[in-house]
A protein has these predicted regions:
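Transmembrane-helix motifs of polytopic, lipid-linked glycan transferases
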Residues: 177-199, 237, 462-466
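Short acidic/glycine- and proline-prone juxtamembrane loop motifs at membrane-interface regions
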Residues: 220-231
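Membrane-interface transmembrane helices that cradle and orient dolichyl/undecaprenyl
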Residues: 198, 236-253, 286
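Loop-to-helix entry region of an early transmembrane alpha helix in multi-pass inner-membrane enzymes
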Residues: 150, 154, 166-188, 447-455
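Extracytoplasmic catalytic/substrate-binding loops of multi-pass membrane glycan-assembly enzymes
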Residues: 115-131, 135-170, 378-383, 398
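Start-transfer (signal-anchor) and selected internal transmembrane alpha helices
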Residues: 1-110, 304-314, 538-550
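Membrane-proximal stem/loop segments at transmembrane-domain junctions that anchor or position
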Residues: 328-430
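Membrane-interface anchor segments at the N-terminal boundary of transmembrane helices
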Residues: 50-66, 173-174, 178-179, 404-489
Length: 588
């Protein structure tokens, strides 16, 4: 039993320390600079999309935090005096969530009706191939074509191919409606997970659901038919069912979770990150059961079941992807190709690209075609190129290594909208969109949204930090399940091909932790206020938070004078970037 407690504390400490460091780095990015997709000029005078950075004021963020804290304390004290919690039943809460879900779905349908956008970029390729399959055209599998290079995309293409039998081939609305339903499922599941994590604090589940709905960057991805939201819904479903298994030890939840993660990886291979996170907790559960079991046969069966859960998930991923391959091979008449080598994605993820560090730059295709589509030769060249990159970064970490990862972090995580508006710009629409809708996508409305969510992003990161600080001694390791998914997503995309459209799901799943952190913070701040209004009570943890935030901001301001800080955190691309961000050099 003592060994189990020690293991729990060690693992808990490692996870919380890693989370604290990563979230703190993102927090510094958020208060010192803001990233967005602007325009850069080539030597020939043509322009292209490029991530630009403008300076931000940490003092403004601190003022917003103070105002939100004051408002939160005032509302919380009124809430306590009104005794609403005593009259607020679980049935009433469930009805409110159902109502909000219906409202959210209606809002999503309305947005789709107001935009009716055709897919662009990669989603356009994906959906075009799905429609080609409807016509019996499987040329995308021929040498050098899309599925010859990216066979792992056949799962999402098969998904849209099947959807076309339901919604028809003349409209893109159907898959977008599926995105709305998937996002609603994600938000409900994250709320249910919060109830599992913090059973003693069930009142915050409604606040978490409201916060998720109000955070609109992910909402705008409902028009982006690339498998992100359906895959996320299945993956979060797998996490939720795994949590239910841990709570009840019901084998039905184990089977459901394994099936969900299998389907998720068919839709989006990046969902393997969720599998790894769940597997880590199941293996910990097995270890915990072994250390506790002694002569208890029930505990012994429990660790065997947890290990079996991991094996079942791996089998499900293999099985679902294998079944998908066989269906596609049967439909197309082509054998599934090997595709581009995975190591080439790491090389690309550690290289410069037109849009931003680590973004797509054509390397994976060039190294594949340049070696006559020989995967072994392509892997050898990619490995050699990777060694050169690592050697260059290690030989000059101050000017090459650290600044690259700083700029890549900003590119992936420091755009307040997570390029959600950029993903809608320039796409054709089946209708003439209203001026207000256009403004929200590419005009002054988009600027207003970006400014607002710049502060919201900081508040979310501060909320997560507050959660970690105020719950540092919590022994409930399982409440970190989705946080470990975020941790995996951050580490993976630090080295893999990156972009805000890849990282936004991992940021969204941290919102429940931010709400929990702010609620704990507001309650702690309220306890500091005496009935007479000004007398402070001794509360070491809360005092530490207040002093810590002030010290961190002051220290960061002082450190901010260094060149390294300016090349990694306080990024600034000059006045032209500011003009572009605020649309000062042009109209709507």
């Amino acid at each position: 039993m003592k060994g189990a407690v020690v293991v729990n504390r060690i693992i808990n400490l490692i996870i919380r320390c890693l989370l604290a460091v990563i979230v703190f780095v993102l927090f510094l990015h958020s208060i010192f600079s803001t990233s967005f997709i602007g325009r850069a000029v080539r030597e020939d005078g043509s322009t292209y999309g490029r991530t630009l950075n403008i300076p931000d004021s940490p003092w403004k963020h601190l003022i917003v935090f103070a105002l939100i804290t004051a408002a939160g304390v005032a509302v919380y004290r009124l809430y306590r005096k009104s005794h609403i919690a005593e009259r607020f039943s679980a049935h009433a809460e469930r009805n409110i969530i159902i109502f909000l879900t219906c409202f959210f779905i209606g809002l999503g349908v309305l947005w789709i009706a107001l935009t009716q956008m055709n897919p662009g970029s990669d989603p356009a390729k994906i959906y075009a191939i799905a429609l080609q399959w409807r016509d019996g055209d499987f040329s995308a599998f021929e040498e050098g074509e899309y599925l010859f290079c990216y066979p792992f995309q056949s799962g999402i293409i098969l998904f849209y191919y099947l959807l076309s039998f339901v919604f028809g081939t003349e409209s893109y609305i159907g898959p977008q409606l599926v995105n709305v339903a998937a996002l609603a499922v994600v938000y409900v599941l994250l709320t249910l997970l919060a109830r599992f994590y913090w059973k003693e604090d069930r009142q915050i589940s409604l606040l978490i659901y409201l916060a998720l709905i109000c955070w609109v960057p992910l909402f705008f991805f409902i028009t982006y038919i690339y498998g992100i939201l359906p895959g996320m819904a299945c993956a979060v479903g797998a996490v939720y069912l795994a949590a239910r298994y841990l709570e009840t030890r019901g084998y039905a939840y184990m089977i459901g979770s394994a099936l969900c993660i299998g389907v998720a990886t068919v839709l989006k291979m990046n969902c393997l990150i969720y599998l790894i996170a769940i597997a880590c907790f199941m293996l910990y559960d097995a270890l915990d059961s072994i250390l506790f079991c002694g002569s208890d046969n029930g505990k012994r069966r429990q660790w065997i079941a947890s290990v079996g859960f991991v094996i079942l998930m791996c089998f499900s991923v293999w099985g679902c992807n294998r079944v998908t391959e066989q269906i596609v091979e049967h439909l197309s008449g082509y054998d599934m190709p090997e595709g581009e080598v995975m190591i080439s994605w790491v090389v690309m993820g550690l290289s410069e690209a037109p849009k931003g560090p680590g973004d797509y730059n054509g390397y994976i295709g060039d190294v594949f075609s340049g070696n006559n589509y020989d995967t072994e030769l392509a892997a050898q060249q990619s490995l050699a190129d990777l060694r050169k990159i690592v050697k260059r970064m290690l030989s000059d970490p101050i000017d090459e290594g650290i600044p690259f990862f700083g700029r890549k972090t900003a590119y992936q995580w420091n755009d307040p909208t997570f390029i959600s508006m950029e993903r809608m710009r320039g796409r054709k629409s089946a209708i003439e969109m209203l001026p207000s809708v256009k403004s929200l996508i590419e005009g002054r409305g988009s600027v207003t949204l970006s400014v607002i969510f710049n502060y919201v992003q900081t508040l979310i990161l501060v909320g997560v930090l507050l959660y970690l600080i105020l719950n540092w001694n919590s022994r409930n390791l399982y409440e970190l399940m989705t946080a470990v998914v975020f941790l995996g997503g951050y580490l993976f995309h630090t080295f893999w091909e990156g972009g805000a459209s890849y990282t936004i799901p991992y940021f969204a799943i941290m919102i429940p932790y931010a709400v929990k952190g702010f609620c704990d913070w507001v309650r702690a701040a309220s306890r500091l206020i005496d009935r007479r209004g000004l007398k402070l009570r001794a509360n070491k943890k809360t005092t530490f938070c207040v002093v810590g935030i002030i010290v961190v901001v002051l220290a960061a301001l002082r450190v901010g004078r260094s060149n390294l800080f300016h090349s990694t955190i306080a990024l600034d691309d000059g006045q032209e970037a500011v003009m572009q961000y605020y649309h000062l050099s042009g109209g709507e």
